[in-house]
A protein has these predicted regions:
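Beta-strand signatures of extracellular beta-sandwich domains
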Residues: 35-39, 80
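Short strand-edge motifs at loop-to-beta-strand transitions and within beta-strands
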Residues: 63-67, 119-121, 130-132
Length: 141
């Protein structure tokens, strides 16, 4: 019996890494880059400048684009992204602090007056291959 418990504990420590495919919709074709970050906790998300995993990719010829993150550990993640149209490496805002560039969060959360909480936008990654959709929109959409 003890060896069965050891066997279960041993192999539970070695969950296979997860691949997350993200289908991004609503992009402005051939304009700037997409800056996308994955945050694995509320504390990490509060420090938006330092995501746990990140990518910057050029926007292609289509309004829809797919990227993948590989080797992710199992857990909850918030995915946040924006299209940096002018290449200044930040999401542009007007004088009221309202974003003027398109952005998206996991769970299709799209708050207009506040940043979503980690729990509102977090997704659970458990299977070796997961796929989500991000719909990019501007505040006025």
């Amino acid at each position: 019996m003890l060896h069965i418990i050891f066997y279960c504990l041993f192999f539970s420590l070695f969950n296979p890494p997860i691949t997350l495919e993200i289908k991004m919709e609503g992009l402005i074709p051939e304009k700037g880059t997409i800056r996308i970050g994955l945050y694995n906790s509320a504390a990490a998300f509060k420090d938006e400048a330092n995501p746990n995993h990140a990518q910057v990719v050029s926007v292609g010829k289509n309004a829809t684009q797919i990227i993948t993150f590989e080797g992710l550990p199992e857990g909850k993640y918030l995915v946040a992204a924006y299209q940096d149209v002018n290449g200044n490496k930040k999401i542009d805002k007007n004088i009221l602090g309202i974003p003027t560039e398109a952005y998206a969060f996991s769970n299709d959360v799209f708050p207009k007056w506040k940043t979503p909480s980690f729990n509102e936008a977090a997704i659970k990654l458990e299977r070796p291959y997961e796929s989500i959709r991000l719909r990019f929109r501007t505040w006025i959409d």
